[in-house]
Amino acid sequence: MPTDITRRTLLTTAGALALLPAPARSAPLVLTPGQTEGPFYPVALPADADSDLVRVQGAAARALGIVTHVGGRVLDRHGRPVPGAAVEIWQCDAQGIYRHPRAPDQQRFDAGFQGYGRTAVDAGGGYAFRTIRPVPYPGRTPHIHVAVIVPGTGRFVTQMYVEGEPLNARDGLLNSIRDPAARRSVIVPLRPSPAEPGALGGTFDIVLDL
């Protein structure tokens, strides 16, 4: 559960994203490509399932890893915010372990890391999470699973990748996206974040075929 400090940080991040100008209507938007959900979506959602994955209610310490702020906007194909949408993310911990009963080495999962979070978009379509920088594990480049739930439309699933990762060139799922522009749209640069000392930040806008 977020502390007052992290609540302020998340609100600041979300507010900054909401103030970004919407894409010009005449500019062609690249639809975010769908990707597989993967085998480790939570069987049961954690009791603490907010947008701050770095702090778990009752845990003695925060999550291992580099704190990373990930946010953006959920837009339709015309660049308009999608009202009422919710965004979920889930990922492995800093050791490459998922919070899931079938995940390898489950007994070593970092108790200070939520592993899953959910948030509603704001009026501008903005969302924000405080998580950790994704790490590789055997067979996969660093990535974060992302799902968008739109009332009356259904659930859209994709994955976010990190720019500059050497394993990107060999990742089968990333390279299954054949269109270069679509593939680039899910690769996000992570840079020092002004929201928190020592943290990284990246923007991942999600464009739905609506």
Task: Please give the residue ranges for each predicted region.
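N-terminal secretory signal peptides and thylakoid transit peptides that target proteins
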Residues: M1-A18
